[in-house]
Amino acid sequence: LRNKRNGLRSLLTGIENGLAIENDISNVQHFANRGITYITLCHNGDNQICDSARHSLNTHGGVSPFGAQVIAEMNRLGLMVDLSHAGEKSFYDALQISRTPIVCSHSNSRALCDVPRNITDEQMRALAAAGGVCQITLYNGFLRTDGNATITDAIRHLEHAIDIMGIEHVGLGADFDGDGGIPGLADASELVNFTKALLRRRYSETDMSLIWGGNWLRVMNLCQQSAQR
């Protein structure tokens, strides 16, 4: 926020797939020392930390014992736990294990688009109850099962999440580096179109600041403050 006030842009770095930790818990500290702010526990397939929402063999039945250690170490170091890509059992296990709020950096509503990678209304409620954030993603196949998504579909997913979780627990996680992008929101240069769509729906400046990173920064700050205690 200080950088923004000074006219500077900031980038937050993360790791998508805890596979990078290998089987060495000290690697969590290694990555934290290099400025990582969050780790997505898994990707498309089970790893040593937890079972995935896609291509899962139910390897651990949720979060593994090593995965529980990883989450505890992330809590200790002030890193956000990201449950996008995690299977449903892994999701609830991680919520129970973590002593700080959790994020889903790029996940949509399964009620609107019934694919395993999206999260259910029950998961959304549990995430909000734990103080976490779900960020809507712009990946076609997670917005509509036919893959023909528009900005209207992205807004539908956002507003469904707001209805279930509250405005304090949502955001946008475009996933432009992972096949995200739809007509009118193809890349970062077109994100202003999302803001315009929110303005047409009479969202306040305060609400838009929460959607556009305020909620994410709240969780990040809580995690970092918890690590300092």
Predicted regions and their residues:
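Acidic-and-aromatic substrate-binding clefts and catalytic sites of carbohydrate-active enzymes
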Residues: A20-E22, R110-N118, R144-G147, T152
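Mid-to-C-terminal alpha-helical segments outside catalytic/metal-binding sites
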Residues: A186-R229
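Conserved, mostly hydrophobic/aromatic
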Residues: G35, V81, H106, C134, ...
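Active-site beta-loop-alpha junctions enriched in small/polar residues
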Residues: G14-G18, N44-D46, L79, S84-F91, ...
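A metal-dependent hydrolase metal-coordination microenvironment
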Residues: L1-I25, L41, D46, A53-R76
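Non-cysteine beta-strand/loop elements that form the S-adenosyl-L-methionine
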Residues: T37-N44, S105, A130-I136, V170-L172
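Histidine/acidic residue-rich metal-binding segments in metalloenzymes
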Residues: D24-N33, H55-V103, P116-G131, T152-E168
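Short acidic/histidine-rich active-site segments
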Residues: T137-L138, M165-A188
